[in-house]
Design a protein with these regions (language model features):
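Active-site groove signature of glycoside hydrolases
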Residues: 1-20
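Beta/alpha (TIM)-barrel catalytic core signal, keyed to glycine-rich beta->alpha loops juxtaposed to Asp/Glu
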Residues: 16-191
Length: 192
């Protein structure tokens, strides 16, 4: 009522552990969904293992929100499978919390494994607008992805990101290295 809408498109659990420990809440969401107040329910997860545990316990959700970007493709296979079963796939972390725009030389040794990759992207794309366009177009090119969530700091960034959708990056092939989770999950990064 306070939102001034008749229904909400989707509600996602943003803490997989809470979702696993709250079968009553999951059941209540199902009841609310049946009334039509909420159209879709699902989960925002950090690892494929979390998603597998949730599906094992509660069955297929309507929506999953996952981190996905040029470097982080851990969810690609399971997303293809879920999409084929009718699950809506939303992604976040297209720019990996801004890591792609940071100067690799200023990064701590924690990121040693990806510094050459980040340097190569910076050299090939020349500026942050092209990097953003390449990364956004990469994610949007995946047929299993329905929605992409990105963060912007101002209207100029939003316009730049939208304009980058008109650029052709099909000839820009950049291989991403296989990296460990400690580089893909920002909560595992050093605090500085």
């Amino acid at each position: 009522e306070r939102l001034r809408v008749k229904s909400i498109y989707g509600i996602l659990f943003h803490d997989p552990e809470s979702a696993l420990e709250a079968p009553k809440v999951n059941k209540e969401l199902s009841v609310i969904k049946e009334t039509g107040i909420v159209k879709k329910t699902g989960y925002s997860v950090y690892t494929p293992k979390e998603l597998e545990r949730l599906i094992s316990k509660y069955g297929l959700p309507d929506i999953v929100q996952i981190p996905f970007n040029h470097l982080d493709r851990r969810f690609e296979n399971i997303s293809i499978e879920l999409k084929a079963k009718g699950v809506e796939i939303h992604t976040r972390s297209t720019f990996l919390q801004g890591l792609y725009f940071m100067n690799p030389n200023d990064l701590s040794d924690h990121f040693k494994q990806v510094k050459p990759y980040l340097n190569f992207i910076r050299e090939k794309m020349c500026d942050n607008n092209l990097i953003a366009g390449f990364l956004l177009n990469f994610v949007l090119s995946k047929p299993f992805i329905d929605k992409v969530v990105i963060g912007v700091n101002n209207v100029t960034q939003l316009k730049t990101n939208l304009n980058s959708l008109n650029k052709d990056f099909s000839n820009d092939t950049i291989e991403a290295p296989d990296v460990l989770d400690h580089l893909l999950i920002p909560s595992l990064w050093p605090k500085n």
